């Protein structure tokens, strides 16, 4: 298998979240940013506060940010609490969805546009890519683009997963 690429149709996605709801890609209104992660991943720990900033930057309803955890419910809940994550965390403990998307590493983000087409794939942690994702989402929701990571932020410009 190979990582789902830009321009390809996103594999179906139906996972239960930590909140008990089931999230289905085909029922989502607007684009979905799906971020695959593991709680033990140091790069994920670096990235998730910025994903939270992205989530808070735009009104909800016109787009979705879903973290897809490859860990247990209890470990995922501890991660959420430690990092102050408020967006939905979906559980893929058996890795069925992860295998379908086949990210090369974690974190990997897939921006899935209307019609379920993958419009962007961002592996690892990349400052510039997060700001570009922000601008793309702003276009989808009709908002001014928010800078998620300013130039003077101390995070490294890139960190592999």
PLM features: what roles do these ranges have?
Residues 38, 70, 114:
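Cofactor-binding loop segments of dinucleotide-utilizing enzymes, especially the Rossmann-like FAD-
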Residues 20, 110-119, 123:
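Short, glycine-anchored, charge-dense loop/turn motifs used at functional sites
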Residues 71, 92-93, 128:
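Short beta->alpha linker loops
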Residues 45-83:
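Structural microenvironment flanking redox-active thiols in thiol-disulfide oxidoreductases
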Residues 24-45, 51:
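Short active-site neighborhood of thiol/selenol oxidoreductases, capturing the structured segment around
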Residues 1-32, 64, 81-82, 102-105, ...:
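Non-globular targeting/processing and membrane-anchoring segments
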Residues 80-115:
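Short, internal strand/loop/helix patches
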């Amino acid at each position: 298998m190979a990582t789902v690429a830009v321009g390809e149709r996103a594999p179906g996605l139906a996972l239960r979240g930590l909140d008990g709801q089931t999230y289905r890609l085909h029922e989502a209104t607007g684009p979905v940013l799906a971020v695959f992660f593991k709680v033990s991943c140091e790069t994920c720990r670096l990235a998730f506060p910025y994903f939270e900033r992205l989530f808070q930057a735009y009104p909800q309803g016109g787009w979705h940010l879903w973290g897809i955890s490859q860990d247990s419910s209890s470990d995922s809940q501890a991660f959420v609490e430690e990092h102050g994550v408020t967006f939905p965390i979906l559980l893929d403990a058996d890795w069925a969805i992860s295998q379908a998307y086949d990210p090369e590493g974690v974190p990997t983000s897939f921006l899935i546009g209307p019609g379920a087409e993958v419009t962007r794939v961002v592996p690892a942690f990349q400052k510039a890519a997060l700001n570009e994702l922000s601008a793309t989402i702003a276009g989808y929701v009709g908002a001014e683009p928010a800078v998620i990571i300013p130039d003077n932020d101390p995070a490294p410009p890139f960190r592999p997963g």
